[in-house]
UniProtKB/Swiss-Prot annotation:
Ferredoxins are small electron carrier proteins that participate in various redox reactions. FdVI is an essential protein required for growth of R.capsulatus. May be involved in Fe-S cluster assembly. [2Fe-2S] cluster binds at C40, C46, C49, C87. Residues 2-106 form the 2Fe-2S ferredoxin-type domain. Binds 1 [2Fe-2S] cluster. This is Ferredoxin-6. Disruption phenotype: Disruption of this gene is lethal. The gene is fdxE. Coiled coil: none annotated. It holds the Pfam family Fer2. InterPro entries: 2Fe-2S_ferredoxin-like_sf, 2Fe-2S_ferredoxin-type, Adrenodoxin-like, Adrenodoxin_Fe-S_BS, Beta-grasp_dom_sf. Belongs to the adrenodoxin/putidaredoxin family.
Amino acid sequence: MAKIIFIEHNGTRHEVEAKPGLTVMEAARDNGVPGIDADCGGACACSTCHAYVDPAWVDKLPKALPTETDMIDFAYEPNPATSRLTCQIKVTSLLDGLVVHLPEKQI
């Protein structure tokens, strides 16, 4: 299991245990973390699972594929340096302690 820390826009923290093989989006959804809408269910066809990866973790994640970066353009206030779609980040033991910040809203 990997601990993933979600920080809402208002500062509320949610620490969840995520099973390797799931996505960060699935971990949020399965644990009732607010702010991850995931309207497309993880198909990389919307931007409602958008989050900002903590800067300390950006280089520890696999690079986003072009399909993800294209979809991030539709997210609320994307940040080219830290924005990711959580449906595209697979949980592994190497992500234990991952911190993601949630945007004010999803669009």
